[in-house]
Amino acid sequence: MYKRAEYQIIKNRLEEPRKFIQVVMGARQIGKSTVVKQVLKDLDLPYLFYSADNVPASNTAWVSDCWEAVRSLKRSNNWESAILVIDEIQKVSNWSEVVKKEWDDDTFNDRNIKVLLLGSSRVRLEKGLSESLAGRFEEIRMGHWSYVEMRDCFGWSLDQYIFYGGYPGAAPLVGDEDRFQQYIQSSIIDATINKDILMDTPIGKPALLRQTFELGAAYSGELLSLNKMLGSLQDAGNTSTLSGYLNLLAESGLLCGLQKYSIDMARRRASIPKLQVYNNALKTVYSPMPFNQAVLDRKSWGRIFESGVGAYLVSQAFVHRFDVFYWRERNDEVDFILRKKNSLVAIEAKGNAEKRTEGLDKFRELFKPTSSFIVGDGGIKAEEFMSMDLMKLF
Protein backbone atom coordinates (compact mmCIF):
# COMPACT_ATOMS: atom_id res chain seq x y z
CA MET A 1 0.00 0.00 0.00
CA TYR A 2 1.29 3.48 -0.92
CA LYS A 3 2.73 5.47 1.99
CA ARG A 4 2.87 9.26 2.01
CA ALA A 5 5.91 11.11 3.38
CA GLU A 6 3.98 11.88 6.58
CA TYR A 7 3.93 8.16 7.40
CA GLN A 8 7.59 8.24 8.47
CA ILE A 9 7.19 11.51 10.40
CA ILE A 10 4.23 10.17 12.43
CA LYS A 11 5.94 6.80 12.98
CA ASN A 12 9.13 8.45 14.21
CA ARG A 13 7.22 10.72 16.60
CA LEU A 14 5.22 7.83 18.11
CA GLU A 15 8.40 5.79 18.59
CA GLU A 16 9.99 8.61 20.61
CA PRO A 17 9.53 8.79 24.41
CA ARG A 18 6.24 10.49 25.39
CA LYS A 19 6.78 14.23 25.36
CA PHE A 20 4.23 16.00 23.11
CA ILE A 21 0.69 15.44 21.89
CA GLN A 22 0.97 14.87 18.12
CA VAL A 23 -1.67 16.73 16.07
CA VAL A 24 -2.26 15.76 12.43
CA MET A 25 -4.27 18.38 10.54
CA GLY A 26 -5.44 18.75 6.95
CA ALA A 27 -8.54 18.89 4.73
CA ARG A 28 -11.09 16.07 4.32
CA GLN A 29 -10.37 13.02 2.14
CA ILE A 30 -6.60 13.48 1.86
CA GLY A 31 -5.75 10.32 3.79
CA LYS A 32 -5.05 11.49 7.38
CA SER A 33 -6.79 8.51 8.99
CA THR A 34 -5.33 6.11 6.40
CA VAL A 35 -1.73 7.10 7.06
CA VAL A 36 -2.25 6.97 10.84
CA LYS A 37 -3.77 3.47 10.56
CA GLN A 38 -0.76 2.39 8.45
CA VAL A 39 1.57 3.62 11.20
CA LEU A 40 -0.43 1.94 13.99
CA LYS A 41 -0.45 -1.34 12.09
CA ASP A 42 3.34 -1.27 11.66
CA LEU A 43 4.15 -0.15 15.22
CA ASP A 44 4.44 -2.87 17.82
CA LEU A 45 2.42 -0.88 20.36
CA PRO A 46 -1.15 -1.29 21.68
CA TYR A 47 -3.55 1.49 20.68
CA LEU A 48 -7.18 2.61 20.77
CA PHE A 49 -8.64 4.58 17.81
CA TYR A 50 -11.79 6.71 18.24
CA SER A 51 -13.61 9.12 15.91
CA ALA A 52 -15.64 12.11 17.11
CA ASP A 53 -17.27 12.57 13.68
CA ASN A 54 -20.77 11.63 14.90
CA VAL A 55 -20.41 12.48 18.59
CA PRO A 56 -22.74 15.29 19.81
CA ALA A 57 -20.67 18.47 20.21
CA SER A 58 -21.92 19.00 23.78
CA ASN A 59 -20.71 15.57 24.95
CA THR A 60 -17.40 16.73 26.46
CA ALA A 61 -17.31 13.67 28.75
CA TRP A 62 -16.75 11.53 25.62
CA VAL A 63 -13.08 12.54 25.40
CA SER A 64 -12.52 11.61 29.06
CA ASP A 65 -14.31 8.29 28.47
CA CYS A 66 -11.87 7.50 25.62
CA TRP A 67 -8.97 8.29 27.92
CA GLU A 68 -10.35 6.14 30.74
CA ALA A 69 -10.78 3.21 28.34
CA VAL A 70 -7.11 3.26 27.32
CA ARG A 71 -5.98 3.70 30.94
CA SER A 72 -8.12 0.76 32.04
CA LEU A 73 -6.74 -1.51 29.28
CA LYS A 74 -3.19 -0.40 30.02
CA ARG A 75 -3.64 -1.32 33.70
CA SER A 76 -5.38 -4.66 33.17
CA ASN A 77 -2.93 -5.81 30.47
CA ASN A 78 0.19 -4.43 32.19
CA TRP A 79 1.14 -2.55 29.04
CA GLU A 80 4.27 -0.47 29.41
CA SER A 81 2.80 2.14 27.04
CA ALA A 82 -0.24 2.67 24.83
CA ILE A 83 -1.39 5.08 22.11
CA LEU A 84 -4.69 6.97 22.18
CA VAL A 85 -5.85 8.26 18.78
CA ILE A 86 -8.88 10.57 18.42
CA ASP A 87 -10.04 11.56 14.92
CA GLU A 88 -12.00 14.79 14.20
CA ILE A 89 -11.33 15.93 17.78
CA GLN A 90 -12.45 19.52 17.02
CA LYS A 91 -16.08 18.33 16.77
CA VAL A 92 -16.32 18.18 20.58
CA SER A 93 -16.93 21.45 22.45
CA ASN A 94 -14.10 22.51 24.77
CA TRP A 95 -12.05 19.53 23.57
CA SER A 96 -8.75 21.28 24.23
CA GLU A 97 -9.50 21.91 27.91
CA VAL A 98 -10.45 18.25 28.44
CA VAL A 99 -7.36 17.05 26.55
CA LYS A 100 -5.16 19.35 28.68
CA LYS A 101 -6.69 18.01 31.91
CA GLU A 102 -6.29 14.34 30.92
CA TRP A 103 -2.80 14.78 29.43
CA ASP A 104 -1.57 16.62 32.54
CA ASP A 105 -3.11 13.93 34.75
CA ASP A 106 -1.17 11.24 32.84
CA THR A 107 2.01 13.29 33.09
CA PHE A 108 1.60 13.78 36.85
CA ASN A 109 0.90 10.08 37.42
CA ASP A 110 3.68 8.85 35.10
CA ARG A 111 1.26 7.05 32.77
CA ASN A 112 3.00 6.37 29.47
CA ILE A 113 0.04 7.08 27.17
CA LYS A 114 1.01 8.72 23.89
CA VAL A 115 -1.68 10.82 22.22
CA LEU A 116 -2.35 11.48 18.54
CA LEU A 117 -5.16 13.86 17.52
CA LEU A 118 -6.52 14.33 13.99
CA GLY A 119 -8.72 17.09 12.63
CA SER A 120 -9.90 18.75 9.43
CA SER A 121 -10.90 22.20 10.73
CA ARG A 122 -7.60 24.10 10.90
CA VAL A 123 -8.85 27.15 12.74
CA ARG A 124 -10.80 25.28 15.42
CA LEU A 125 -7.82 23.01 15.97
CA GLU A 126 -5.30 25.84 16.14
CA LYS A 127 -7.56 27.94 18.39
CA GLY A 128 -7.87 25.08 20.89
CA LEU A 129 -4.17 24.27 20.71
CA SER A 130 -3.04 27.85 21.29
CA GLU A 131 -5.60 28.54 24.04
CA SER A 132 -5.18 25.43 26.19
CA LEU A 133 -2.31 23.27 24.97
CA ALA A 134 0.60 25.66 24.43
CA GLY A 135 3.90 23.86 24.91
CA ARG A 136 2.24 20.43 24.94
CA PHE A 137 1.83 19.62 21.24
CA GLU A 138 3.52 19.34 17.84
CA GLU A 139 1.70 19.91 14.53
CA ILE A 140 1.99 17.59 11.54
CA ARG A 141 0.33 19.31 8.57
CA MET A 142 -0.91 17.24 5.63
CA GLY A 143 -1.73 18.80 2.26
CA HIS A 144 -3.60 17.57 -0.80
CA TRP A 145 -1.81 14.89 -2.81
CA SER A 146 0.88 16.22 -5.14
CA TYR A 147 1.40 15.28 -8.78
CA VAL A 148 4.34 13.02 -7.80
CA GLU A 149 2.15 11.13 -5.30
CA MET A 150 -0.75 10.67 -7.75
CA ARG A 151 1.71 9.58 -10.46
CA ASP A 152 3.53 7.09 -8.24
CA CYS A 153 0.38 5.67 -6.64
CA PHE A 154 -2.09 5.71 -9.57
CA GLY A 155 0.09 6.11 -12.68
CA TRP A 156 -1.45 9.49 -13.56
CA SER A 157 -0.15 11.83 -16.25
CA LEU A 158 0.40 15.52 -15.47
CA ASP A 159 -2.67 16.50 -17.53
CA GLN A 160 -4.81 14.11 -15.48
CA TYR A 161 -3.48 15.64 -12.25
CA ILE A 162 -4.10 19.21 -13.49
CA PHE A 163 -7.71 18.34 -14.40
CA TYR A 164 -8.74 15.84 -11.72
CA GLY A 165 -6.73 17.23 -8.78
CA GLY A 166 -5.31 15.14 -5.97
CA TYR A 167 -8.03 13.26 -4.08
CA PRO A 168 -6.91 9.62 -3.77
CA GLY A 169 -10.45 8.35 -3.15
CA ALA A 170 -11.59 9.79 -6.49
CA ALA A 171 -8.71 8.32 -8.53
CA PRO A 172 -10.45 5.00 -9.43
CA LEU A 173 -13.50 6.95 -10.68
CA VAL A 174 -11.90 9.16 -13.35
CA GLY A 175 -13.01 6.83 -16.15
CA ASP A 176 -16.62 7.72 -15.33
CA GLU A 177 -17.12 11.51 -15.21
CA ASP A 178 -20.54 11.23 -13.49
CA ARG A 179 -19.24 9.02 -10.68
CA PHE A 180 -16.18 11.24 -10.25
CA GLN A 181 -18.30 14.39 -9.99
CA GLN A 182 -20.71 12.71 -7.57
CA TYR A 183 -17.81 11.72 -5.29
CA ILE A 184 -16.35 15.24 -5.27
CA GLN A 185 -19.78 16.77 -4.59
CA SER A 186 -20.93 14.41 -1.83
CA SER A 187 -17.75 13.20 -0.12
CA ILE A 188 -15.84 16.47 -0.22
CA ILE A 189 -17.91 19.58 -0.94
CA ASP A 190 -21.15 18.57 0.85
CA ALA A 191 -19.33 16.85 3.72
CA THR A 192 -17.01 19.82 4.32
CA ILE A 193 -19.73 22.47 4.11
CA ASN A 194 -22.41 20.55 6.05
CA LYS A 195 -20.32 18.62 8.58
CA ASP A 196 -17.39 20.96 9.16
CA ILE A 197 -18.43 24.55 8.48
CA LEU A 198 -22.18 24.61 9.22
CA MET A 199 -21.93 22.39 12.30
CA ASP A 200 -19.01 24.34 13.73
CA THR A 201 -20.01 27.94 12.95
CA PRO A 202 -23.29 29.88 13.21
CA ILE A 203 -24.03 30.86 9.59
CA GLY A 204 -26.82 33.31 8.81
CA LYS A 205 -27.21 32.27 5.17
CA PRO A 206 -26.13 28.65 4.51
CA ALA A 207 -27.34 28.77 0.88
CA LEU A 208 -25.18 31.85 0.26
CA LEU A 209 -22.12 30.06 1.67
CA ARG A 210 -22.57 27.26 -0.87
CA GLN A 211 -23.18 29.73 -3.73
CA THR A 212 -20.01 31.61 -2.73
CA PHE A 213 -18.03 28.39 -2.93
CA GLU A 214 -19.53 27.34 -6.28
CA LEU A 215 -18.90 30.75 -7.86
CA GLY A 216 -15.39 30.96 -6.41
CA ALA A 217 -14.48 27.44 -7.54
CA ALA A 218 -15.72 28.09 -11.08
CA TYR A 219 -13.60 31.29 -11.20
CA SER A 220 -10.53 29.71 -9.57
CA GLY A 221 -7.33 31.28 -10.93
CA GLU A 222 -9.09 34.58 -11.70
CA LEU A 223 -9.52 37.94 -9.99
CA LEU A 224 -13.10 38.62 -8.94
CA SER A 225 -14.03 41.56 -6.72
CA LEU A 226 -16.41 40.99 -3.82
CA ASN A 227 -18.77 43.57 -5.36
CA LYS A 228 -18.88 41.60 -8.62
CA MET A 229 -19.54 38.44 -6.61
CA LEU A 230 -22.41 40.22 -4.84
CA GLY A 231 -23.97 40.96 -8.22
CA SER A 232 -23.87 37.27 -9.17
CA LEU A 233 -25.31 35.86 -5.94
CA GLN A 234 -28.88 35.82 -4.67
CA ASP A 235 -29.65 37.41 -1.29
CA ALA A 236 -25.97 38.19 -0.94
CA GLY A 237 -25.98 40.70 1.91
CA ASN A 238 -22.71 42.68 1.95
CA THR A 239 -19.03 42.29 1.13
CA SER A 240 -18.04 41.63 4.76
CA THR A 241 -20.38 38.60 4.81
CA LEU A 242 -18.74 37.27 1.62
CA SER A 243 -15.27 37.95 2.98
CA GLY A 244 -16.14 36.01 6.14
CA TYR A 245 -17.46 33.09 4.08
CA LEU A 246 -14.27 33.03 1.99
CA ASN A 247 -12.26 32.81 5.22
CA LEU A 248 -14.35 29.85 6.41
CA LEU A 249 -13.91 28.08 3.06
CA ALA A 250 -10.14 28.66 3.26
CA GLU A 251 -9.96 27.30 6.80
CA SER A 252 -11.63 24.12 5.58
CA GLY A 253 -9.18 23.58 2.72
CA LEU A 254 -11.69 24.26 -0.09
CA LEU A 255 -11.21 27.78 -1.51
CA CYS A 256 -9.22 30.89 -0.65
CA GLY A 257 -8.91 34.45 -1.91
CA LEU A 258 -5.25 35.36 -2.56
CA GLN A 259 -4.33 38.94 -1.70
CA LYS A 260 -2.33 41.23 -3.97
CA TYR A 261 1.34 41.40 -2.97
CA SER A 262 2.20 44.78 -1.51
CA ILE A 263 4.64 45.98 1.14
CA ASP A 264 1.74 48.05 2.53
CA MET A 265 -0.47 45.69 4.57
CA ALA A 266 -3.54 47.96 4.31
CA ARG A 267 -3.35 47.90 0.49
CA ARG A 268 -2.94 44.13 0.59
CA ARG A 269 -6.09 43.67 2.65
CA ALA A 270 -8.12 46.04 0.48
CA SER A 271 -7.12 44.28 -2.75
CA ILE A 272 -9.43 42.36 -5.09
CA PRO A 273 -9.07 38.65 -4.21
CA LYS A 274 -7.73 36.14 -6.70
CA LEU A 275 -9.89 33.08 -6.11
CA GLN A 276 -8.07 29.79 -5.74
CA VAL A 277 -9.23 26.25 -4.93
CA TYR A 278 -6.97 24.01 -2.82
CA ASN A 279 -7.53 21.08 -5.17
CA ASN A 280 -8.31 21.48 -8.87
CA ALA A 281 -11.04 18.81 -8.74
CA LEU A 282 -13.09 21.48 -6.93
CA LYS A 283 -12.87 23.71 -10.03
CA THR A 284 -13.27 21.14 -12.80
CA VAL A 285 -16.29 19.52 -11.14
CA TYR A 286 -18.14 22.64 -12.39
CA SER A 287 -16.52 22.53 -15.85
CA PRO A 288 -18.92 22.03 -18.78
CA MET A 289 -16.14 20.15 -20.62
CA PRO A 290 -14.97 16.61 -19.86
CA PHE A 291 -11.22 15.97 -19.59
CA ASN A 292 -10.64 14.84 -23.21
CA GLN A 293 -12.28 18.03 -24.57
CA ALA A 294 -10.79 20.47 -22.04
CA VAL A 295 -7.22 19.35 -22.72
CA LEU A 296 -7.67 20.20 -26.44
CA ASP A 297 -9.29 23.61 -25.87
CA ARG A 298 -6.32 26.00 -25.52
CA LYS A 299 -8.24 28.82 -23.84
CA SER A 300 -10.05 26.63 -21.30
CA TRP A 301 -6.94 24.57 -20.62
CA GLY A 302 -4.92 27.75 -19.94
CA ARG A 303 -7.33 28.67 -17.11
CA ILE A 304 -7.46 25.10 -15.76
CA PHE A 305 -3.65 24.90 -15.87
CA GLU A 306 -3.17 28.16 -13.95
CA SER A 307 -5.69 27.07 -11.31
CA GLY A 308 -3.94 23.67 -11.06
CA VAL A 309 -0.56 25.30 -10.41
CA GLY A 310 -2.20 27.60 -7.84
CA ALA A 311 -3.90 24.67 -6.09
CA TYR A 312 -0.55 22.93 -5.74
CA LEU A 313 1.06 26.10 -4.35
CA VAL A 314 -1.62 26.92 -1.74
CA SER A 315 -1.70 23.32 -0.53
CA GLN A 316 2.10 23.27 -0.19
CA ALA A 317 1.96 26.69 1.51
CA PHE A 318 -0.24 25.23 4.26
CA VAL A 319 2.18 22.33 4.85
CA HIS A 320 5.43 24.33 4.66
CA ARG A 321 4.14 27.60 6.13
CA PHE A 322 4.82 30.15 3.40
CA ASP A 323 2.50 32.84 1.98
CA VAL A 324 1.02 32.98 -1.52
CA PHE A 325 -0.05 36.24 -3.21
CA TYR A 326 -0.59 37.51 -6.76
CA TRP A 327 0.68 40.83 -8.12
CA ARG A 328 -0.92 43.31 -10.50
CA GLU A 329 -0.18 46.91 -11.43
CA ARG A 330 -2.17 48.37 -14.35
CA ASN A 331 -1.53 45.93 -17.23
CA ASP A 332 1.33 44.07 -15.55
CA GLU A 333 0.50 40.91 -13.63
CA VAL A 334 2.28 37.94 -12.02
CA ASP A 335 0.21 34.87 -11.20
CA PHE A 336 1.84 33.82 -7.93
CA ILE A 337 4.21 35.46 -5.45
CA LEU A 338 5.56 33.16 -2.73
CA ARG A 339 6.97 34.65 0.45
CA LYS A 340 8.82 32.97 3.32
CA LYS A 341 10.48 35.32 5.81
CA ASN A 342 12.37 37.82 3.60
CA SER A 343 12.53 35.67 0.45
CA LEU A 344 10.23 36.29 -2.53
CA VAL A 345 9.62 33.95 -5.47
CA ALA A 346 7.64 35.13 -8.53
CA ILE A 347 5.94 32.50 -10.71
CA GLU A 348 4.01 32.90 -13.95
CA ALA A 349 1.90 29.89 -14.95
CA LYS A 350 1.64 29.68 -18.74
CA GLY A 351 -0.72 27.02 -20.06
CA ASN A 352 -0.69 28.34 -23.64
CA ALA A 353 1.63 30.38 -25.88
CA GLU A 354 -0.75 33.36 -26.14
CA LYS A 355 -0.35 34.54 -22.54
CA ARG A 356 1.71 37.71 -21.95
CA THR A 357 4.53 37.52 -19.37
CA GLU A 358 5.91 41.10 -19.28
CA GLY A 359 4.66 41.42 -15.69
CA LEU A 360 7.45 39.14 -14.50
CA ASP A 361 10.10 41.61 -15.77
CA LYS A 362 8.33 44.52 -14.07
CA PHE A 363 8.07 42.63 -10.77
CA ARG A 364 11.79 41.73 -10.92
CA GLU A 365 12.63 45.40 -11.45
CA LEU A 366 10.46 46.60 -8.54
CA PHE A 367 10.92 43.92 -5.87
CA LYS A 368 14.15 41.99 -6.68
CA PRO A 369 12.78 38.51 -5.87
CA THR A 370 15.11 35.64 -4.86
CA SER A 371 13.96 33.82 -8.01
CA SER A 372 11.39 34.31 -10.75
CA PHE A 373 10.38 32.06 -13.62
CA ILE A 374 7.67 30.82 -15.98
CA VAL A 375 6.06 27.41 -15.46
CA GLY A 376 4.80 25.82 -18.68
CA ASP A 377 5.10 27.21 -22.22
CA GLY A 378 8.54 28.82 -22.65
CA GLY A 379 9.75 28.15 -19.11
CA ILE A 380 10.33 25.31 -16.65
CA LYS A 381 8.37 22.24 -17.72
CA ALA A 382 5.24 21.89 -15.59
CA GLU A 383 6.11 18.28 -14.78
CA GLU A 384 9.53 19.34 -13.52
CA PHE A 385 8.06 22.17 -11.43
CA MET A 386 5.37 19.93 -9.89
CA SER A 387 8.10 17.44 -8.90
CA MET A 388 10.53 19.87 -7.26
CA ASP A 389 11.04 20.65 -3.58
CA LEU A 390 9.51 24.14 -3.33
CA MET A 391 11.43 24.93 -0.15
CA LYS A 392 14.65 25.02 -2.19
CA LEU A 393 13.31 28.06 -4.07
CA PHE A 394 13.63 30.33 -1.03
For each feature predicted by the language model, list its residue ranges.
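Accessory nucleic acid-recognition modules appended to NTPase machines
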Residues: 177, 181-341
